[in-house]
Amino acid sequence: AGNAGLVASLGAGRVIDYRLEDYAKSTERYDVVYDTLGISSFREARSVLTRTGRYVCPVLGFGLLSASLRTAIIGGRKARFSATGMLKPEVQRAMHAKLVDLVEADRFAPVMDRTYPLAELVEAHRYMETGRKRGNVVVV
């Protein structure tokens, strides 16, 4: 699909369109499964992760929270919630410095989908919930 092509163009090693392929049934093994929409689960991803693989998702729900806590204690495969704001300040500073370097080198190209005025915040949120966004949705 269109988003799969976009993700591949951003440098992903392998992109799976969840509407066409059930990655959990794959015989391939992955170091990272990054679930951008939060439609999968660590339980589903576990079978395709390498021994030290990571399932990463920016959408925190009870299942991911439970799996993150459980896998922090046991096992090689890990479930992780990904949110920049939860990182240590020194890690955030290093990430921001790298981002500044990329911008200054003209190597940073954010993908912008739509911009909404603040008065249309509800519409912006509805659009994001469709799962069809192709980049950042900005509210100004």
Segments (PLM) and residue ranges:
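Terminal helix/beta-alpha structural elements that buttress the NAD(P)+-binding lobe
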Residues: 1-140
